[in-house]
Amino acid sequence: MSPLELDEWLSRPTDRTIETLRKLDGDLIVLGAGGKMGPTLARMARRALPADRRVFAVSRYSSSSARVDLEAHGVQTISCDLLHREAVANLPDAANVVYMAGHKFGTSDAPELTWMMNSVLPAIVAERYSVARTVVFSTGCVYALTSTASGGSKEDDVLAPPGEYAYSCIARERVFTHFAKSCGTPTLMFRLNYAIDLRYGVLYDVASKVWQGKPVDVTMGHVNVIWQGDANARALESLALAQYPPKILNVTGRECISVRWLAEQFGRLLARTPIITGQEAELAWLNNASQSFELLGDVTVSLEEMITATADWVRNGGVSLGKPTHFESHDGKF
């Protein structure tokens, strides 16, 4: 599979996505569209919507190739630093907003940037798009670590996570909630755990280490994952679920997956003996996404399919985005 074929797969809308978006009125704007998921989500929205409904993708666009590719697929791109209030004020109106901006890696070294990106920036955006349906990308890291026996954290669990990054993500949610209360903005908090693209993600991290003969740390002993195409579809479909007070939705796969088991599976598929380091801790970051399955149906790509495709990608020298997830972090430091 080529990168072009992979992007087509990740941006392929489901029938449900097409039906959902076509029932909603107005244009759609993706804020923070230049990250790992943004380009394929914007392309999926473009593929799902009629031609007369515009899709905007807003980012600083450090990569010009990403911008050119989006334009080639009918997405209107806008270069903008979302921390600049005047620039945000000049963005086009849209009835539907997918907010994907945020900062994670490097929090330990520059916490002030993380707090600016995850708490100040949301205030600027929420004020600008106060009447739009808004899906806010969040993370399962806002929860406390939990046991595998619990089945994962649920949407109404108390937020008591480890680490400064996680608290900045709670701040993002609180800011959007404040503006939802003040303005009646229909909002959904999209708490996502580990989207999988063959070029990055937990599965790529584990598979590449097994392939290269590097140790796999199993201290964070269990994880949840979901195919990025399914996560994109669920995010777009969640626009129809946005409400006031804001709705919270955990989004990930059904399985609570052993990292040791993953390493063994990749060892079998790649004909390598995995090197295991560490010992599984009693607690891990795990989400219970049963509500998303009830509301949005099943995923289109199974765990087995993701594992097989990732092994093939790594074995055949597929490119990497060079962005490890650092899922192994058990103290919340990134």
Give, region by region, the residue ranges found by the protein language model.
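Conserved Rossmann-fold NAD(P)-dependent oxidoreductase catalytic core, especially the SDR/UDP-sugar
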Residues: D27, N96-Y99, K104, P122-E164
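NAD(P)H-binding glycine-rich loop region in Rossmannoid oxidoreductase-like domains
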Residues: P39, S64, D69-M117
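Catalytic helix-loop patch of NAD(P)-dependent Rossmann-fold dehydrogenases
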Residues: E112-M116, V120-L121, V142, S147-M189
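Amphipathic terminal alpha-helices
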Residues: S2-L21, L303-F334
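Mid/C-terminal beta-alpha module of Rossmann-like enzyme folds, strongest
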Residues: K214, G221, R234-A289, D331-G332
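NAD(P)-dependent short-chain dehydrogenase/reductase
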Residues: P162-E164, I170-D230, F266
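N-terminal Rossmann-fold cofactor-binding loop
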Residues: V58-S63
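N-terminal Rossmann NAD(P)H-binding glycine-rich loop of SDR-like oxidoreductase domains
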Residues: I29-R46
